[in-house]
Amino acid sequence: MSGLILDSGAVSYFADASADYARAVMAVFGSEDLWPPRVPSVVLVECLTGHPQKDARTHMFLKGCDVTTILTESAARRAARLRTLAGRGSAVDAALVALAEPRGLIITSDKQDLTALAANAMGVTIEVI
């Protein structure tokens, strides 16, 4: 998948950020040809509540993202391997890192697990929002 990928913390952060700040960040990533970001559908499990009113801002933000619904068997196997090598991290985090290969950028609010998973990945960079 590579490119710019957002985890649940980053989705929630951008959804709650001020409109001016969000537009500024989008402009920066857009100038680097990294916008719109990709959001694997499994991330929605962590950033949505199932309550329409509580999720309204997140749904609005996600309309501007490329929500990816495919986790192939090979990506799932790669995620399992990365998780085993790291000895930590959730299945969702491992899937994000596997999908970011090669040379992808993941924006997160929780750097520890993703950094451990990315240590064995091909050129995946983790940045904290």
Roles of regions detected by a PLM:
Residues 116-129:
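Short, basic/aromatic-enriched C-terminal tail that caps enzymatic domains
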Residues 68-112, 118:
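Active-site neighborhoods of divalent-metal-dependent phosphate/nucleic-acid chemistry enzymes
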